[in-house]
Amino acid sequence: MDIIGGQHLRQMWDDLADVYGHKTALICESSGGVVNRYSYLELNQEINRTANLFYTLGIRKGDKVALHLDNCPEFIFCWFGLVKIGAIMVPINARLLREESAWILQNSQACLLVTSAQFYPMYQQIQQEDATQLRHICLTDVELPADDGVSSFTQLKNQQPVTLCYAPPLSTDDTAEILFTSGTTSRPKGVVITHYNLRFAGYYSAWQCALRDDDVYLTVMPAFHIDCQCTAAMAAFSAGATFVLVEKYSARAFWGQVQKYRATVTECIPMMIRTLMVQPPSVNDRQHHLREVMFYLNLSEQEKDAFCERFGVRLLTSYGMTETIVGIIGDRPGDKRRWPSIGRAGFCYEAEIRDDHNRPLPAGEIGEICIKGVPGKTIFKEYFLNPQATARVLEADGWLHTGDTGYRDEEGFFYFVDRRCNMIKRGGENVSCVELENIIAAHPKIQDIVVVGIKDSIRDEAIKAFVVLNEGEILSEEEFFNFCEQNMAKFKVPSYLEIRKDLPRNCSGKIIRKALK
């Protein structure tokens, strides 16, 4: 079944410009408060100019171009400008340092980079090492260094015509981007995403939150991340809605931005919810137009209830990962919501719980969450130049092994337990980090929490809790351990406590556990 009607991304943008014309497509707000607005017609013209820019720099179908940018209009121009000429975007996490960025350049075979002045010194060093295929850099800033092989993105773009000059044959099976996973447990792998994947993601995510062309979808998620691209941007554009891209998340500014742009849909991760909850209460807390808040794991029931009550919103749970492109399990339009369930499988997907021998398990039994989709269409195509890694997670018939543990009930609602790699083995017992974190997060003095397993010569692993306290709070070890003993089985009570000012996180807000072990 062809959900997207054989339409690749170049056709999508040409059609959107024709159908929606002067309707607002994109609003970008910088951290400094600068706002840029583009209609569908204007945005398509900027995309065409950018495509022409890349063509003049020698980029052709199949070439890889890396983007190392914060949220900005140029990211959107480049993303779709590249796919219009059949080239491939390689977004780089804007928080990565030199060694990690160089590794992605080397392993993606990117020959051109678009970045900003703040990241340029790092790439100067990378070029001096001569270990990549990078031959040219475009800077989005007006001020340019006097270096060979460096151009002004804006100047070159503005010199280009608004109609596309190079239009090679495209297929929905063509690769649109290679998105490297966050690599919290190992080296990042390049997830190959096709034109079909992105078109399907737009339709699917718009369906999931019942998006209409009069909606305004605001996100603070980083543009180089799958959530921003497939759950937010592609959904908004596919529905003819307005997409608001904020440069960086600020707990103090968030609700003002939601109100300012009259956003009707947004997305949140637990870190956002917790930091929003510690902001001083305001009479304007409920003065917004949000009807859906897309939410991604993990949150305790007490935290969820407090957030929804204070801000007058409801959470639409969505479960997925880079490899699934979208939230393949989640709350569905008109469906009942059963917290803490992560929902039911969406259209075009099947989901099962399987044991260690890859056999389906009945309702109520914990095993690995496995998803069936179509590679290159409803789930990722493969890992770039890594068939061994692809074979480890993706079966020939389309079943994807997520590496997550969970269970389902008799009505087909699924429940997330934890990442397999986050299960602590303590004296013969399996302990879920997420379970403990949800319990401990209910303590009124605690703002943020992560639990990890550390080596123990007697019980395999001991449990250590790292907590961040609410401002001005003091928490003694006695109070902490008493709270744990009252709320969890004795074998689950942490052995160690460390109070910190913050916790290490990757671009998607996930805690980097290996940095704490």
Swiss-Prot record:
Keywords: Ligase
Taxonomic superkingdom: Bacteria
Pfam name, any one: AMP-binding_C
InterPro entries, A to Z: AMP-bd_C, AMP-bd_C_sf, AMP-binding_CS, AMP-dep_synth/lig_dom, ANL_N_sf, CaiC
BP-aspect Gene Ontology terms: carnitine metabolic process; fatty acid metabolic process
SUPFAM superfamilies with a match to the protein in the record: Acetyl-CoA synthetase-like
Signal peptide segment: none
Pathway named in the protein's UniProt entry: Amine and polyamine metabolism; carnitine metabolism
Enzyme Commission number: 6.2.1.48
Reaction catalysed by this enzyme: 4-(trimethylamino)butanoate + ATP + CoA = 4-(trimethylamino)butanoyl-CoA + AMP + diphosphate; crotonobetaine + ATP + CoA = crotonobetainyl-CoA + AMP + diphosphate; (R)-carnitine + ATP + CoA = (R)-carnitinyl-CoA + AMP + diphosphate
GO molecular function: carnitine-CoA ligase activity; crotonobetaine-CoA ligase activity; medium-chain fatty acid-CoA ligase activity
Similarity-based family: Belongs to the ATP-dependent AMP-binding enzyme family.
Role this protein plays: Catalyzes the transfer of CoA to carnitine, generating the initial carnitinyl-CoA needed for the CaiB reaction cycle. Also has activity toward crotonobetaine and gamma-butyrobetaine.
NCBIfam families noted in UniProt: PRK08008.1 (NF005947)
PANTHER family (UniProt xref): ACYL-COA SYNTHETASE, MEDIUM-CHAIN ACYL-COA LIGASE ACSF2, MITOCHONDRIAL
HAMAP family cross-referenced by the UniProt entry: CaiC
Protein name, UniProt field: Crotonobetaine/carnitine--CoA ligase
